[in-house]
Structures are given as C-alpha cells and as structure tokens.
C-alpha cells in the first residue's frame, strides 16, 4: 500500500478549479516532488493532503487513513513544513521545539532526550539556546524541519522548502533532507518551482499546471521522454516566412517550438544541428542574435508538456499565500 494515495482529488473555489481530478500514489521511502508555478495548485493539494482544506470531490488517504473521515489519525502520522516560517523569533531554538513537543503531548523526559538529538540532526546543536532572531534563513528552515519531526512522523510534507534561501543554504537543506530521509525512514512529499531542486532531490516528479497533472515519472525518464538529447535556443535578427519549416528540415532536429522571436530546437546531435543552423542563416541572409546549446533539462520537459516555460508561468501567476498554521484539533 502506498503511503499517499490520491484518487480524482478536486478542489474548487467558486467557479475556479484549483486542483483538477488529480490521481497518483507515493510509495514508502520515496521523495516525491510536485513541480509547477505559483498558482498551479500545489499548495492547495498539500493543504488537502494535510487535512487543512476539505476536497470538493475525490479521495486521499495518508498511511491508509482518509483525510476527511480520519483526519486526526492522519495528523498524528504526518509532519508539515509550510512555506512561511512560523518559529517564534524571540524564543530560543530549544524553546520553540519544546512548545511544539508539548502540543503533541510528548512527556517531559522524552522531550529532554529528543530535542537535543533533533537539533543535532539539523546541525543546530551549538545554537540550541540562542534566540531564533539571530538565525540566518537557512538555519531557521532547518529548525522548522526539526520541529516538524518532534512527534516522529513517517510522512513529511514540505511546501517550497527552500524558497527565499541563498544557493548555499538551499544545498545544505537538500543534503539534510536526504540524510534525514535515510536515517528516519521517511516518505517525503515536497512542492517546488525550482527545477534543480526537483532534479536533485526527487525519486519521482509530478508536473502540475493549472491544477492538472501533465506528467509523472523519475527525472531521468521525464527528460528521456521528450525529443532530442540537446536543446538549442536561438533568436534571429529577423524571421523569414516559413522559417520554422526550414528549421525543422535541419539535420538531427526532432522538434521546433517558436516562442516570440526565440526558437527552441530539440536535436539528437547538438553540434551537427548548430553547424547546419549557422549555414541556413547565412544562406537566408539573416543574423543569429543569440544561440545556446545545452543538454535536456526539466525546464525543457516543462515546456514540452505545458507549452510554456516555468519562469513565464511564475511571472503571470496570481499572487497567492501558502502560509498556514497547523491545527491538531
């Protein structure tokens, strides 16, 4: 049985469909990523799976328990790390941990053993009695993760865990999550709009756009599922008539997608296509304004399945706050 089972899960807000009939499963021990822009439905999905928002229709089970009918059982088995950091800035790391442990009814003697061990696990042992307002963003995020583990959950939900962190802190959080998953036998479900994060961390990725599931597989298989081994991104001084047809006839070209004045060309052999492209531009009397060649990435996968780039979707997405407090009642 999967740790997370989702069947035709839907959430509507009036006429707006935030999550549209999603179905998938997350196996025990897996790091499962939900990849998509802000407004794609990722945070709404997390809120339903963690019992904070009821679905309009469909079903979801966490550890075998229904998120609506058996919400209390679900809450005892999950850890939730929201996007917004909620630790009390005036209290110490130890005090923040202690308050959360008390909310879960953890006995005093167990708290005394557990809290130092968790702070050590997230490399905050030396900062245990320092006020959180002295912490960097990465340190605060590590504290939030430790706090989410006080009741020893086996299924861990993280909503955009590295948003707002600098690159060094992001990598530190990645490494810590991988280690904690291994040491504590966790199943992790996280949302992200960072392609590199999904690629590095996740065993499988579900790409979500406009509330719909558009692709699901391992990062390697997703990248292998689209045409070509290389992506050429090229723009020209001008675009002649039928230029797309000319590009499609170049050697080794698998696919051409125009985007304004930029053309994304999927190629089985990037160098050979590049040489032919330069010759075609010369013969047409036009200038190549910019050209880049790279191996296939998850960004290319996103473009292939949705028709637009993730960064474009992020810019056009409506503002939405995914912060929430966890209520055990």
Task: Outline where the language-model segments fall.
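Non-catalytic alpha-helical coupling and interface elements of nucleotide-dependent molecular machines
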Residues: 105, 227, 231, 303, ...
């Amino acid at each position: 049985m999967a740790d997370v089972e989702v069947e035709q899960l839907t959430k509507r807000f009036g006429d707006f469909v935030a999550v549209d009939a999603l179905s998938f499963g997350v196996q025990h021990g897996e790091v499962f990523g939900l990849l998509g822009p802000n407004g794609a439905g990722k945070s709404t999905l997390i809120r339903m799976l963690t019992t904070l928002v009821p679905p309009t229709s469909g079903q979801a089970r966490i550890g075998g328990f229904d998120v609506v009918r058996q919400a209390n059982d679900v809450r005892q088995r999950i850890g939730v790390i929201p996007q917004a950091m909620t630790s009390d800035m005036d209290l110490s790391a130890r005090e923040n941990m202690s308050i959360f442990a008390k909310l879960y009814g953890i006995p005093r003697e167990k708290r005394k053993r557990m809290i130092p061990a968790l702070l050590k696990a997230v490399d905050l042992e030396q900062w245990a009695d320092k006020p959180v307002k002295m912490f960097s963003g990465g340190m605060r995020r590590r504290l939030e993760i430790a706090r989410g583990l006080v009741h020893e959950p086996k299924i861990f939900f993280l909503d955009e865990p590295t948003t707002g962190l600098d690159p060094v802190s992001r990598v530190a959080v990645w490494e810590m999550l991988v280690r904690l998953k291994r040491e504590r036998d966790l199943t992790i479900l996280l949302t992200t709009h960072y392609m590199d994060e999904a690629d590095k961390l996740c065993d499988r990725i579900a790409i979500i756009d406009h509330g719909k599931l558009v692709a699901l597989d391992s990062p390697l298989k997703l990248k292998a599922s689209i045409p070509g081994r290389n992506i050429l991104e090229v723009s020209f001084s001008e675009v002649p008539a039928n230029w797309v047809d000319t590009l499609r006839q170049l050697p080794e070209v698998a696919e051409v997608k125009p985007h304004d004045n930029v053309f994304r060309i999927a190629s089985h052999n990037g160098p050979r296509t590049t040489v032919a492209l330069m010759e075609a531009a010369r013969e047409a009397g036009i200038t190549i304004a910019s050209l880049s060649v790279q191996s296939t990435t998850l960004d290319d996968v996103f473009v292939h399945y949705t028709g637009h780039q993730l960064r474009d979707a992020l810019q056009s997405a409506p503002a939405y706050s995914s912060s929430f407090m966890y209520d055990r009642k």
